[in-house]
């Protein structure tokens, strides 16, 4: 079609020197609005961009030649990433409500355009991006895996306040909307269509062409974006009888169940889901404009709070990782990672099978090796089980399942490993075994191949000691279960080539993980800091404290599990071995734990043996096993030893802060920000507290040092504060300025 008009609207702002939008109107009245923020990798809404969009909508509404509109992005893999998080981060409590009401007006203008509107979504369409398309009549999404649509604001400690909390329930129904809003979910195109969030899923290569044709066919059709009650959107699918009941007389049941679910999930530590639920509850069925005002009120209670600041800080740290190569702190200049095309895995047990599944899931061919056929079978079965679960939930097609399974291969020898760019070993955690498999492997692979050890405690430098090429030996420590835990520690030894470190860092990101680079040191970072947490928990039990009270206190603090539950989960024997490793290096600060040794001697090693501190069989499952006290040489918890929850929390958290300070002083990790990222993603340290160092800042260095000195006097020298903390207390410094 011939083009009648092409125009841009420049924004007079230093941050946006040129127009973020380009409008084209074709001869038949089809307008195409392209979003392409200059100088940015993603489209996002800063205040100037919102103002520009607003002016364009005013212009479109006044035109008589426009018959339909298609909104499309020119950023590869990105539709609209939402609001500029930098602006959110700067907002204080009681921030100008115009930052919410302004976009409300803009998106209402979009909804009220006097002609049909179609969103052509290719790539991330989240937050304000999703709220944009909720204000349009029809939504088409590409089948690209990068196309993700949803409202993740809850994960930033706020709520979808640009119309999302109001429009989504009216459009797709109450239950489906709450599922997205309260969990901060983003959906792929297929799931978004099933939810009613998009109308069609289209091959990415022809999305624009299809969207234009779709919009032309809708010329003259009744609008959906403002034809619902009070000027809101219409419901895209007719409600079932059950839905009609639950959105009418029975809606109290829906909100009651949702509130109970939120409390179970968050323990009340995160105010945003409850605030969002309240906004939906008040706004659902209210006049549309009034419902939007509830969003203004609701988000106003969340902006600038400590929880919001902690979660936004976490977001920025994750964004930094995406841009990094992993060697910035090593002082080696610019290093490009190698591209990994094929992965080998030595050891096909629980960890090895999990790593093989993860690599194949990201499209990498994998070759597994084990000395036992049954272990290889377990590796295959583990991958199949995870994929079958996705298949069952319709998050994967049968064809995708078959393709991914075909990427897995296995053998009892090294056949095929000569073509692997990297081999990840997950064999027995014994140095002699690591040395043996490394020596065997080096005989059959080219000099360019990388050997990555999944060891959790053994020094990488020592593993590489006898290697012909120690520069290609590196640590790649996954956490169990591999498919769930987001952290990977990338550990460089004394001779590890920075290019190898950068390659593992890049591979971890390709696998969907968050990598943190760590210097070779006993326990590395996470297990070293976690050591005192577990050890002090066990010592409290030996002192006669009820272990269920210890776990309860730490869950109340925000930890996902208490130290005693964690012992059962990781294996008491594994924890005892880690304690032995750490105590060899720091005998005064981390003396070997006698409680763990006693339990291992008694055969009480945790969940895997169905014999730990808790029951794992019969009707008593999950309850405390009183015989654990007997194996520790105790008759039962002492009635004379019942510290308060806050005393338990202090006893367990302060040594972690102390060890974090030692790690930073020794250069084990580059910064407090990286340390906090590792502790949140590796241990589940409560994100609402911002991380271990952020929590220490909230307490204040002086208070931390005084509390540690008091504990050192009462309980022993292992609590002696780190020199870094003492200096911070003296100079009134913080980990984060």
Roles of regions detected by a PLM:
Residues 76-80, 126-127, 458-459:
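Short, active-site-adjacent cap segments at secondary-structure transitions
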Residues 2-72, 94, 101-102, 108:
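Conserved CoA-thioester-binding segment of acyl-CoA-metabolizing enzymes
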Residues 68, 114-116, 148, 450, ...:
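Proline-centered loop/turn at the N-terminus of a beta-strand
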Residues 74, 104, 108-156, 160, ...:
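Glycine-rich beta-to-alpha active-site loop
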Residues 71, 84, 132-133, 192, ...:
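Hydrophobic/aromatic residues within transmembrane alpha-helices
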Residues 48, 62, 75-90, 107:
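Amphipathic alpha-helical interaction surfaces in cytosolic regulatory modules
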Residues 3, 17, 21-28, 36, ...:
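N-terminal glycine-rich phosphate-binding loop for ADP-containing cofactors
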